[in-house]
A protein has these predicted regions:
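ABC-family P-loop ATPase nucleotide-binding domain
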Residues: 1-38, 324-341
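ABC transporter nucleotide-binding domains
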Residues: 27-34, 39-233, 239
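Short, structured secondary-structure boundary patches
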Residues: 64-65, 78, 158-163, 173, ...
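An acidic, carboxylate-rich microenvironment
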Residues: 85, 101, 123, 138, ...
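Short, basic, helix/turn surface patches
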Residues: 124, 164, 303-311, 328-341
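ABC transporter nucleotide-binding domain
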Residues: 198-284
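Short, charged/small-residue-rich alpha-helical element at the C-terminal edge
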Residues: 251-325
């Protein structure tokens, strides 16, 4: 223990030390963390050494092609599937040891909504409210949040696909969760339905402070609503961070003639140019180095048609991550069932 040095009370100008205050509680930095989480079904590794870090608040986009391991991961976050190895922490606590306390604080919509088609939207929600011991007033509240108040008395079988998805989200919201997990919530919707669900997700996160994890295989959807993304392919987390971070620093491209002479002069400056047709490719350089390189080439009689910094588009970076093959390990296990990813 450390003690602050104080002046003796008899000293001139002595001021009693202020009482120490307890540290101010800091908000939980991550709503969800996984540490080395792996899931195997028999010899098949579906999720491999996954380290997610989902910040509290905002929208976390979980991107990956079909079968990449998105649904399996979300099931493990809900305790519906048990990790083969690794740890899942939700709200800073181990899920396995604190499941009964954690799960009531989570809402989810995994692999589509389930409801009684012959009952109305409101009746379906009352059943969920009864099961979760929620106040009946929450039914009207969530209907309003998802924009189904006018359709509350309509049978669920008469709902459009987009309305059914919103009903499923309403069911997930009825307990007032702090964390919402949505698995491909816009799958199969027309553009209007996609926009409705997207706007609802952003509203839940930014206006109501709910942490939302939403999975999708479409970059264009996640790009319009997520603050942070995790990209998974073949069970491996290939990238995690802001979407802007997917763009690399780019390449400095010079269109020159003659190319061979330009390469020789740039190498003399200590640079490492690569030629591609009538272009020279360099890593990004400081402005003063670019100016020096251009002056050297012009002085040597090399014609320069263009100098530009090229960056990958988000789509190019995403496709590069998700189309590169990943070798998955196999386990010597011979028992167990195969599961969906």
């Amino acid at each position: 223990m450390m003690f602050a040095q104080t002046t003796h009370p008899s000293a001139v100008g002595y001021t009693p030390p202020a009482p120490q205050m307890p540290p101010i509680a800091q908000p939980q930095q991550f709503a969800v963390e996984t540490r080395g989480v792996t899931k195997r079904y028999g010899r098949q590794t579906v999720v491999n050494q996954l380290n997610l870090a989902i910040p509290s608040g905002g929208v976390y986009g979980f991107l990956g092609p079909n079968g990449a391991g998105k649904s399996t991961t979300m099931k493990m976050l809900l305790g519906l599937a048990k990790p083969t190895t690794g740890e899942v922490r939700v709200f800073g606590r181990d899920l396995r040891a604190n499941r009964a306390d954690i799960l009531p604080r989570i809402g989810s919509l995994i692999e589509g909504p389930a409801f009684y088609p012959h009952l109305t939207g409101a009746q379906n929600l009352r059943i969920v409210a009864d099961y979760l011991s929620c106040d009946k007033s929450s039914v009207d509240a969530v209907l309003d949040i998802v924009g189904l108040t006018d359709a509350a008395g309509k049978r669920a079988r008469q709902y459009s696909l987009g309305m059914k998805q919103r009903l499923g989200i309403a069911m997930a919201l009825i307990s007032g969760p702090e964390l919402l997990l949505l698995d491909e919530p816009t799958n199969g919707l027309d553009p209007a339905g996609v926009a409705e669900i997207r706007n609802l997700i952003v509203q839940l996160a930014h206006d109501r402070g709910i942490t939302v994890m939403v999975s999708s295989h479409l970059l264009s959807e996640i790009e319009q609503m997520a603050d942070i993304v995790g990209i998974i392919q073949s069970g491996h987390l290939r990238y995690q961070g802001p979407l802007s971070g997917l763009r690399d620093q780019g390449q400095l491209v010079m269109k020159v003639s003659p190319v061979n002479a330009a390469v020789a002069h740039l190498e003399a400056l200590g640079l490492r140019p690569q030629s591609a047709g009538d272009e020279i490719i360099l890593p990004p350089l400081r402005d003063d180095l670019i100016a020096e390189a251009v002056a050297r080439l012009v002085g040597a009689g090399v014609r320069i048609a263009r100098v530009e910094l090229r960056r990958k588009s988000l789509e190019e970076a995403f496709l590069e991550l998700t189309e590169t093959p990943v070798v998955m390990p196999t386990s010597p296990q011979t028992t167990g069932r195969r599961g969906r990813a």
